[in-house]
Design a protein with these regions (language model features):
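Catalytic cores of soluble metabolic enzymes centered on carboxylation/carboxyl-transfer
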Residues: 1-340, 348, 423-473
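A generic structural motif
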Residues: 15, 156, 367, 392, ...
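Residue-level recognition of beta-strand microenvironments
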Residues: 73, 373, 417-418, 435
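Acidic, low-complexity mobile loops and tails
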Residues: 326-396, 405, 411
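A residue-level detector for short acidic-glycine micro-motifs
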Residues: 372, 398-401, 416-421
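Short hydrophobic beta/alpha edge segments that flank linear recognition/processing sites
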Residues: 383-407, 423-443
């Protein structure tokens, strides 16, 4: 009988990014278990014996949200966590309207591996942690990564305009690197649980002081690890849309070979020192001027654009991501602001934006079973013609055995109730009430939002780009 010193279990549930139950999704495919993975999936993964294909499975709202239990073991607690991290990294579920807590587990496991797997979290840990991720996403939403890259390339081209050869080379590199840098960065900015995983895994690769990022590890190598962390590396058995593209992989391999050759020639050197040497116009011992010029240009080419990844630790520094930490006694230090109920509710809406209400209606916040009253025989929350205040209860929606009371987002008067029967199945975004609000909605002008986001992006970019250009100069 095999006996292991440690084990860890993750419960895979049908939930959204805020861990609220999310019913109605359908599992169309699920990756096979990998070596060392113990998966109790209630038979969901049994394939059709005749075709060998996965049988679609719909997650009905009338049942518990649990999908599977994932267990890994190891010779110690850290090894079991590392095995679980690899299981979560390589687990792929796909299907229409499907949402699970897979990424939540992946981010959390990376956080514990970075901060201490022997930490002793209490039941008060998860909601503040999710609130912190809401803060991360709120700040990330104010950055346009594509605009930042294009702006950065224009700065490089302006710096190279004195030389036709340098201008041409810079243009080619910018074209080559747009997808190499942009695809993983876009995922990290859009998906807060993955951003948490990245920040945790790379917390020793950088320092953030006074709004400035200093890389302690070669950011080009961090980029390689980022593809691995996101399961977008060349070894991933996935369609092209979900893995690194061939031309990008070739560039990574060339860069890896270049820095390995540099290390052989110059020896192991801390990255800040090595970066300064490679940017210096003075060749070190063992290199002639012509050869060193080629080395220096290659280094600048491989590093071009990687400063964009400095945006991520800057976001973390601004919201205080690393203030959530494990103490010497293994308790967890949680900033007080993350316990504020109103703030928690706001950040939950950032993680999972509620469906947009029209000015004259209120829609269902999620799919599930609709109830107009607290219990049979009790009065309905609202009647037609009744005035309600912001924060008044309007209805209850049951999702996977969880009864959630929904409150009015604004004050107004109910003109018509559109769902008449208790127990009616409603879908997310379905109109439930026709109303007349006390105050008319004013939606943000998309043009103004675009200008605001680009302005914020430029402020971030000035900090990361100026550091790089000043160092090159």
């Amino acid at each position: 009988i095999q006996r292991s010193a440690a084990a860890v279990e993750a419960r895979l549930n049908a939930t959204d990014d805020s861990l609220s139950p999310h019913a109605g999704g359908e599992i169309m495919s699920w990756s096979d278990p990998i070596e060392g993975e113990v998966r109790d999936d209630q038979g969901i993964c049994f394939k059709n014996p005749d075709t060998g294909l996965f049988v679609r499975y719909r997650l009905a709202g009338a049942y518990d949200s649990n999908i599977a239990l994932l267990v890994t073991v190891g010779e110690d607690r850290r090894k079991s966590y590392e095995h679980l991290r690899e299981v979560l990294r390589r687990t792929v579920l796909r299907g229409p309207e499907l949402q699970t807590n897979l990424q939540f587990h992946y981010g959390l496991v990376n956080w514990f591996l970075a901060n201490g797997v022997d930490a002793k979290p209490t039941t008060q840990f998860v909601v503040p942690y999710l609130t912190l991720l809401g803060e991360l996403l709120r700040e990330a939403n104010e950055i346009d990564a594509d605009y930042a890259f294009d702006k950065l390339c224009r700065r490089y081209l302006a710096a190279a305009k004195g030389s036709a050869a340098a201008t041409k080379a810079t243009e080619e590199i910018c074209v080559l690197k747009k997808t190499l840098l942009g695809r993983p960065l876009g995922r990290l900015l859009r998906q807060p649980h993955l951003l948490s995983a990245w920040l945790s895994a790379n917390k020793n690769a950088f320092e953030v002081e006074r709004g400035r990022v200093t890389w302690l590890r070669n950011p080009f190598l961090v980029l390689i690890d980022t593809y691995y962390l996101l399961y977008m590396d060349a070894a991933a058995d996935l369609p092209a849309a979900h893995r690194i593209w061939e031309q990008d992989q070739e560039l990574l391999e060339e860069g890896t070979a270049f820095y390995a050759a540099i290390e052989r020639r110059l020896g192991e050197t801390p990255w800040p020192e090595l970066d300064a040497i490679l940017k210096s116009k003075q060749p070190p011992k063992g290199f002639d001027s012509k050869q060193w010029t080629q080395v220096r240009e290659a280094h600048l080419g491989f590093q071009l654009g990687t400063e964009l990844y400095g945006l991520l630790p800057m976001i973390a520094g601004k919201v205080g991501f690393f203030d959530l930490r494990v103490n010497a006694d293994l308790t967890i230090s949680i900033p007080k602001r993350l316990f504020d109920r109103d703030h928690q509710a706001k950040m939950k809406k950032v993680l999972v934006p509620p469906p947009v209400n029209k000015s004259d209606e209120i829609v269902a916040v999620s799919g599930g079973m609709y109830y107009a009253q607290e219990a049979p025989g009790m009065p309905h929350f609202v009647q037609e013609g009744q005035h309600f205040e912001a924060g008044d209860a309007l209805y209850i929606v049951e999702v996977m055995k969880m009864f959630n009371k929904v409150y009015a987002p604004f004050s107004g008067t109910v003109d018509k109730i559109l769902v008449q029967s208790n127990g009616t199945i409603v879908s997310k975004g379905q109109p439930l009430f026709k109303v007349t609000p006390d105050e008319q909605f004013t939606e943000e002008d998309p043009v103004e939002a675009k200008v605001r986001i680009r302005s914020n992006t430029e402020q971030y970019l000035e900090l990361v780009a100026n550091q790089h250009f000043n160092a090159v100069a």
